[in-house]
């Protein structure tokens, strides 16, 4: 058996050290572990008939709580001073040890004490904690009790209690408390507390809402300094307890303050917060006492984090859906429990989202519309002034708050919480039609396996007399004015079976419907386990497309006519810089390409470790996205140059808009290559991977925002993360159905223009204003320095504060001045007026969120005047530690919860010693640690 350890020594030693209790009182010999069986109630000590061993009813693990009694004294009739035998599967500790270590918050926070399975016996005044992972389900709180007379008044007992090793001498008369009755638990009669406390659980999806009555009793032993002394055995109903609990008195009072004279007033206030917030239980009573019960992390990973904390100590049950355990909006202050397994997963997620289908068809088309190479000039300017700083801002906000876009913006600036909701709405609208492109890719992918691809010639049943096969080089023949290529007719007549316009919706395309269902099935099964499942899929879907892009680019630059296409791509026309549309297109492509202001980057960063290097990730994602856009541009314009040579026309005349760029132009070019089937299969598989990467991110930001914003509704109606993902996928699929009818391509083009392009710059402007101006560039810089150890550069801060907002506002105003209604097929089809009304309705879905949520938060805010309400809605909801001023620190969660509970106690229960509670409200937790004599003398505040 190991030697005895001092409490303070144990709290500062390694977890492998063991606390061994002193020998039990005379006549009580402790049992060995081998003597403690798993059946019924039996004697805990040799010769002690009244000691009980109670086994819980847990179905997952056996929970043992030892109820000792004084030899020869029936339960409830005498003070208990005997030791508490310790079982490894129990959570046992001492109030005295916690009282002794109250002034050492850091050891309590960062040190774990555990015992090995042996015959140790717990004496009052010593610490025992344990390591096992066991489920606890029986509602039991048992303490030693004093005599009670018929009126319920406590009779002081004269039993002597041996002093613990490290505590001062214990007063000979134990503190007293009224006693009531005996209850039955697990078939054994147990003397329990006179105090009934109602335990309200607001846990999460793993723990159903419950109201369990727990009988508790304060030990009633104090030393000469007023510190609480006594053994405690505890189990809590409904809590999954993978780690032990320790009990920490928040205010140490003398024994006299334990007396109660009114039985009706003997109620204990209890508040259980989420398991994610240290599974803490704040308990206070009518005389100002309060206890906080917390879990002590003891797993290998948690111990390593406590010794070498790279991130804040893990807070709660490690589970895939732990963020569903939030009970209210205050739970959003806690960091997200789930994290990326490694940094590569996060980087691949960001790259996979930013490098999507927009790089393949939108970038070449925008470059073509903006005069070729001159487009790269405003594109790079906006990239370095707006896009990169905004990406860094989004990653910082997501990583710091640990929330999705709605929760993050709501914490930093509640008035602009609607900007986060608007981003989620835009992402949801995109998910409804973005999946259609994935469906097209699936259709083309399987069609490419045919021996002869159907878009090569005009000998198919869907071809029309206008079908014209481009002539080989050397033949001077131009296409007729009404001609259509085989790939164009295959896409419109076979795949889409396109109608005459939006006013002619037509029938459902069942082949596309099947492809759409396949696309959503892949999205669902890749995201149903949140980032743990999608991150594994991205190892392939986010890397393999780059291999294919390089292969296709190398093949394209070797085609005849590629030089002419590259000349169009890289040769700028400087006069086009005066055209406002060039800047508008460059800004739109920047935001669509990098994926900023859609909420996905904030959502991804919320799963980061707290000290992740954000700047490095920002540079990596931006650089890869820029390089990929250039590679795709080289591939696209080399292909267009070859097509222009084949058709004996200009590069400007062969490019298509919208999805036609990738499903008309590219297939036609690859049909002329050797091994056409191979190149087609590779190309459409690349499109499939790129589309899935983007769709994963879009679905994840919607799911994350729903779970962060409506945890109670989700817990009540859906329950599991898989059900939430299924719900989002089904709803998005249903809203995407109009895109796969015969007139769906017109609807697709309308949605793409109004849902994303029109609103995206306004959302980016509002986001920069909310974070950089109202939350403050200084605050954000401080947050970044707290996370990474280095503050943002002057360049980033100036872009956040001045350059970025000004440039965004100017481009947004220019876009309104130079606004043009969308068309289809390069102006061949013009939408009816009512279609534009539908488009603006889609745009308003996101835009109205910003003023709407601002009004709601204003009406909900406190304040007597208009400006007081405005100030309150602009005030961040992020808690800053009163000790160090930081959000994530070793003082944060205990400080916050204890201080808030002290304030709640002041409003609900009138304390016996108001001066003590007032000191607690002024000074925070430290004043609450002191005894009344200490507090009245000035306490930690020196007042």
Curated annotation (Swiss-Prot):
Residues 103-122 are annotated as: Disordered. It is found in: Membrane. One of its GO terms (biological process) is multicellular organismal-level water homeostasis. Residues 439-510 are extracellular. It holds the Pfam family SNF. Expressed both maternally and zygotically. Developing embryos exhibit expression in the posterior hindgut, foregut, midgut, Malpighian tubules, anal plate, Garland cells, and a subset of cells in the central nervous system. Central nervous system expression is seen in segmentally repeating in cells flanking the midline of the ventral ganglion. Isoform A and isoform B are colocalized in both the nervous system and the fluid reabsorption system. The chain crosses the membrane at residues 346-366, 373-393, 418-438, 511-531, 539-559, 591-607, 618-638, 679-699, 723-743, 754-774, 799-819, 836-856. This is Sodium- and chloride-dependent GABA transporter ine. InterPro entries: Na/ntran_symport, Na/ntran_symport_inebriated, SNS_sf. Glycans are attached at residue 476. One of its GO terms (molecular function) is amino acid:sodium symporter activity. Disruption phenotype: Flies lacking this protein, in a wild-type background, display no observable behavioral defects. In a Shaker mutant background, flies lacking ine exhibit downturned wings and an indented thorax. Flies lacking ine exhibit increased excitability of the larval peripheral nerve by causing the defective re-uptake of the substrate neurotransmitter of the ine transporter and thus overstimulation by this neurotransmitter. Flies lacking ine increase the growth of the perineurial glial layer of the larval peripheral nerve. One of its GO terms (cellular component) is basolateral plasma membrane. The lineage of its organism: Eukaryota, Metazoa, Ecdysozoa, Arthropoda, Hexapoda. Plays a role in neuronal membrane excitation, important for normal response properties of the photoreceptor. Able to control excitability from either neurons or glia cells. Ine negatively regulates neuronal sodium channels. Controls neurotransmitter-mediated signaling pathways associated with the structure of the larval peripheral nerve, ine and eag control perineurial glial growth through partially redundant pathways. Isoform A and isoform B are both functional, although isoform A functions with greater efficiency. Has a role in osmolyte transport within the Malpighian tubule and hindgut. Residues 1-345, 857-943 are cytoplasmic. Coiled coil: none annotated. PROSITE patterns: NA_NEUROTRAN_SYMP_1, NA_NEUROTRAN_SYMP_3. Keywords: Developmental protein, Differentiation, Glycoprotein, Membrane, Neurogenesis, Neurotransmitter transport, Symport, Transmembrane, Transmembrane helix, Transport. Belongs to the sodium:neurotransmitter symporter (SNF) (TC 2.A.22) family. It is a multi-pass membrane protein. The keyword Acyltransferase does not apply.
């Amino acid at each position: 058996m190991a030697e005895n350890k001092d409490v303070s020594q144990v709290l500062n030693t390694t977890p492998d050290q063991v606390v061994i209790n002193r020998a039990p009182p005379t006549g009580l010999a402790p049992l060995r572990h081998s003597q403690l069986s798993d059946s019924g109630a039996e004697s805990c000590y040799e010769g002690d008939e009244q000691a009980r061993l109670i086994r819980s009813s847990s179905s997952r693990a056996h929970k043992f709580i030892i109820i000792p009694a004084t030899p020869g004294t029936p339960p409830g009739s005498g003070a208990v001073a005997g030791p508490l035998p310790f079982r490894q599967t129990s959570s046992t500790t001492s109030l005295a040890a916690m009282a002794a270590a109250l002034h050492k918050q850091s050891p309590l926070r960062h040190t774990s004490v555990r015992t090995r399975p042996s015959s140790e016996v717990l004496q009052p005044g010593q610490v025992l904690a344990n390591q096992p992972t066991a489920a606890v389900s029986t509602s039991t709180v048992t303490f030693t009790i004093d005599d009670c007379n018929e009126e319920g008044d406590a009779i002081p007992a004269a039993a002597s209690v041996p002093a613990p090793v490290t505590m001062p001498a214990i007063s000979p008369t134990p503190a007293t408390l009224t006693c009531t009755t005996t209850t039955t638990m697990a078939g054994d009669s147990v003397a329990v507390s006179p105090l009934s406390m109602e335990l309200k659980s607001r846990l999460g999806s793993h723990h159903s809402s419950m109201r369990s009555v727990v009988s508790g009793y304060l030990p009633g032993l104090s030393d000469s300094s007023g510190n609480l002394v006594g053994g405690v055995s505890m189990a809590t109903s409904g809590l999954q307890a993978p780690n032990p609990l320790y009990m920490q008195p928040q205010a140490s009072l003398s024994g006299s303050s334990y007396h109660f004279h009114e039985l009706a007033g003997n109620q204990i206030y209890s508040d259980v917060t989420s398991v994610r917030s240290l599974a803490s239980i704040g308990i206070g009573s009518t005389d100002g006492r309060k206890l906080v019960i917390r879990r002590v992390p003891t797993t290998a990973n948690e111990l390593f984090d406590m010794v070498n904390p790279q991130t804040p100590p893990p807070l709660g049950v490690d589970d895939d859906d732990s963020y569903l355990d939030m009970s209210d909006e205050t739970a959003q202050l806690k960091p997200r429990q789930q994290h990326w397994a490694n940094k590569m997963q996060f980087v691949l997620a960001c790259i996979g989202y930013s490098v999507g289908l927009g790089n393949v068809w939108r970038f070449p088309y925008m470059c073509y519309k903006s005069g070729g190479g001159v487009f790269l000039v405003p594109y790079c300017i906006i990239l370095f002034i707006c896009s990169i700083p905004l990406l860094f801002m989004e990653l910082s906000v997501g990583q710091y708050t640990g929330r999705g876009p709605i929760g993050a913006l709501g914490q930093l600036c509640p008035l602009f919480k609607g900007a986060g909701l608007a981003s989620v709405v835009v992402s949801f609208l995109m998910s409804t039609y973005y999946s259609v492109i994935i469906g097209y890719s699936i259709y083309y992918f399987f069609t490419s396996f045919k021996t002869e691809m159907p878009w090569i010639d005009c000998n198919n049943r869907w071809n029309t007399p206008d079908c014209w096969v481009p002539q080989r080089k050397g033949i001077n023949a131009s296409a007729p004015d009404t001609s259509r290529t085989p790939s164009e007719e295959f896409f419109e007549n076979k795949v889409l079976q396109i109608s005459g316009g939006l006013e002619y919706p037509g029938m459902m395309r069942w082949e596309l419907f099947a492809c759409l269902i396949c696309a959503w099935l892949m999205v669902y099964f890749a995201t149903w386990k949140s980032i743990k499942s999608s991150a594994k899929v991205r190892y392939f879907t986010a890397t393999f497309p780059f291999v294919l892009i390089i292969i296709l680019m190398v093949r394209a630059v070797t085609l005849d006519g590629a030089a002419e296409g590259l000349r169009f791509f890289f040769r700028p026309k400087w006069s086009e810089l005066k055209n406002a549309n060039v800047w508008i297109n460059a800004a739109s492509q920047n935001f669509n390409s990098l994926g900023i202001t859609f909420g996905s980057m904030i959502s991804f960063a919320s799963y980061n470790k707290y000290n992740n290097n954000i700047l490095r990730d920002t540079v990596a994602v931006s650089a890869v996205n820029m390089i990929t856009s250039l590679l795709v541009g080289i591939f696209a314009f080399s292909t267009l140059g070859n097509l222009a040579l084949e058709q004996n026309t200009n590069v400007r005349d062969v490019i298509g808009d919208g999805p036609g760029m990738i499903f008309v132009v590219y297939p036609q070019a690859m049909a002329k290559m050797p091994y056409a089937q191979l190149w087609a299969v590779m190309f459409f598989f690349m499109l499939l991977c790129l589309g899935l990467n983007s769709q994963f991110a879009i679905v994840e930001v919607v799911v994350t925002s729903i779970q962060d914003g409506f945890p109670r509704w989700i817990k009540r109606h859906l329950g599991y993360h898989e059900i939430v993902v299924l719900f989002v996928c089904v709803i998005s699929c249903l809203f995407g159905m109009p895109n796969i009818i015969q007139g769906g391509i017109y609807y697709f083009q309308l949605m793409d223009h109004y849902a994303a392009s029109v609103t995206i710059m306004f959302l980016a402007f509002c986001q920069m204003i909310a974070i950089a101006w109202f939350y403050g560039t200084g605050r954000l810089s401080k947050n970044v320095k707290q996370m990474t150890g280095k503050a943002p550069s002057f360049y980033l801060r100036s872009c956040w504060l001045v350059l970025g907002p000004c440039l965004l506002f100017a481009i947004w105003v220019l876009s309104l001045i130079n606004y043009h209604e969308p068309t289809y097929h390069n102006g061949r089809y013009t939408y009816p007026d009512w279609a534009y009304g539908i488009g603006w309705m889609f745009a308003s879905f996101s835009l109205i969120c910003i003023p709407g949520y601002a009004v709601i938060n204003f009406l909900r805010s406190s304040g007597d005047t208009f400006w007081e309400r405005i100030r309150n809605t602009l005030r961040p909801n992020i808690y800053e530690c009163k000790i160090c001023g930081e959000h994530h620190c070793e003082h944060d969660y205990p400080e916050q919860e204890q201080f808030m509970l002290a304030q709640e106690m002041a409003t609900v229960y009138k304390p016996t010693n108001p001066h003590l509670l007032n000191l607690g409200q002024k000074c925070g937790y430290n004043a609450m640690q002191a005894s009344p004599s200490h507090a009245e003398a000035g306490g930690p505040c020196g007042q």
